[in-house]
Amino acid sequence: MSNIDWDLWLKKPTVTIGQACALSLGIDPDKMTHRDKERDDFQRRLKLLIEIVFFMGNIRVASTNSENIDSEIYLDSFSEWAVNIVHWDTPNELKTLVSGTSET
Protein backbone atom coordinates (compact mmCIF):
# COMPACT_ATOMS: atom_id res chain seq x y z
CA MET A 1 0.00 0.00 0.00
CA SER A 2 1.21 3.45 -0.87
CA ASN A 3 1.37 6.30 1.58
CA ILE A 4 -1.58 8.39 0.34
CA ASP A 5 -1.74 12.16 0.82
CA TRP A 6 -5.34 12.07 2.07
CA ASP A 7 -5.25 15.76 2.90
CA LEU A 8 -4.90 16.44 -0.83
CA TRP A 9 -7.20 13.74 -2.21
CA LEU A 10 -10.11 14.42 0.13
CA LYS A 11 -10.16 18.06 -0.99
CA LYS A 12 -10.51 17.15 -4.68
CA PRO A 13 -14.16 17.29 -5.73
CA THR A 14 -13.60 14.99 -8.72
CA VAL A 15 -11.27 12.13 -9.56
CA THR A 16 -10.94 9.80 -12.51
CA ILE A 17 -12.51 6.37 -12.33
CA GLY A 18 -9.03 4.86 -12.13
CA GLN A 19 -8.04 7.16 -9.28
CA ALA A 20 -11.23 6.30 -7.39
CA CYS A 21 -10.50 2.58 -7.72
CA ALA A 22 -6.95 3.08 -6.50
CA LEU A 23 -8.05 5.16 -3.51
CA SER A 24 -10.68 2.57 -2.60
CA LEU A 25 -7.90 -0.02 -2.33
CA GLY A 26 -5.53 2.22 -0.37
CA ILE A 27 -3.25 2.82 -3.37
CA ASP A 28 -1.93 6.32 -4.03
CA PRO A 29 -3.06 7.17 -7.59
CA ASP A 30 0.03 9.36 -8.07
CA LYS A 31 2.30 6.41 -7.27
CA MET A 32 0.29 3.65 -8.90
CA THR A 33 2.38 1.23 -10.92
CA HIS A 34 1.48 -0.99 -13.84
CA ARG A 35 1.63 -3.89 -11.37
CA ASP A 36 -1.02 -2.17 -9.21
CA LYS A 37 -3.28 -1.81 -12.25
CA GLU A 38 -2.93 -5.53 -13.01
CA ARG A 39 -4.06 -6.63 -9.55
CA ASP A 40 -7.23 -8.69 -9.65
CA ASP A 41 -8.96 -6.58 -7.02
CA PHE A 42 -8.19 -3.37 -8.93
CA GLN A 43 -9.45 -4.85 -12.20
CA ARG A 44 -12.66 -6.19 -10.60
CA ARG A 45 -13.47 -2.85 -9.01
CA LEU A 46 -12.60 -0.95 -12.18
CA LYS A 47 -14.82 -3.13 -14.36
CA LEU A 48 -17.80 -2.78 -12.01
CA LEU A 49 -17.29 0.95 -11.54
CA ILE A 50 -17.19 1.61 -15.29
CA GLU A 51 -20.44 -0.35 -15.72
CA ILE A 52 -22.12 1.56 -12.89
CA VAL A 53 -20.96 4.98 -14.10
CA PHE A 54 -21.95 4.50 -17.73
CA PHE A 55 -25.05 2.32 -17.46
CA MET A 56 -26.64 2.76 -14.04
CA GLY A 57 -26.19 6.41 -13.10
CA ASN A 58 -25.65 5.64 -9.40
CA ILE A 59 -22.55 7.86 -9.24
CA ARG A 60 -22.49 11.51 -10.27
CA VAL A 61 -20.31 12.04 -13.35
CA ALA A 62 -18.30 15.23 -13.87
CA SER A 63 -17.03 14.43 -17.38
CA THR A 64 -16.65 11.47 -19.70
CA ASN A 65 -13.67 10.45 -21.77
CA SER A 66 -13.26 7.95 -24.58
CA GLU A 67 -10.87 6.16 -22.23
CA ASN A 68 -13.43 5.17 -19.59
CA ILE A 69 -10.81 4.93 -16.84
CA ASP A 70 -10.08 8.65 -17.34
CA SER A 71 -13.69 9.81 -17.01
CA GLU A 72 -14.21 12.01 -13.95
CA ILE A 73 -16.63 11.28 -11.13
CA TYR A 74 -17.44 13.10 -7.91
CA LEU A 75 -15.40 11.61 -5.07
CA ASP A 76 -18.15 12.03 -2.45
CA SER A 77 -20.71 10.30 -4.69
CA PHE A 78 -18.28 7.46 -5.37
CA SER A 79 -17.51 7.08 -1.66
CA GLU A 80 -21.20 6.91 -0.79
CA TRP A 81 -21.74 4.19 -3.40
CA ALA A 82 -18.62 2.20 -2.46
CA VAL A 83 -19.36 2.24 1.27
CA ASN A 84 -23.16 2.04 1.42
CA ILE A 85 -24.24 0.30 -1.78
CA VAL A 86 -21.57 -2.28 -2.64
CA HIS A 87 -20.02 -2.38 0.84
CA TRP A 88 -16.43 -2.34 -0.34
CA ASP A 89 -13.74 -2.47 2.31
CA THR A 90 -12.24 1.01 1.86
CA PRO A 91 -9.74 3.08 3.82
CA ASN A 92 -11.29 4.94 6.76
CA GLU A 93 -10.23 8.25 5.22
CA LEU A 94 -12.46 7.63 2.21
CA LYS A 95 -15.37 6.77 4.50
CA THR A 96 -15.22 10.28 6.00
CA LEU A 97 -16.80 11.61 2.79
CA VAL A 98 -19.93 9.56 3.37
CA SER A 99 -22.82 11.44 4.98
CA GLY A 100 -23.06 10.84 8.70
CA THR A 101 -19.65 9.19 8.95
CA SER A 102 -16.99 10.68 11.17
CA GLU A 103 -13.28 10.00 10.96
CA THR A 104 -11.99 7.54 13.53
Sequence positions of predicted segments:
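Low-complexity, PEST-like segments
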Residues: 1-104
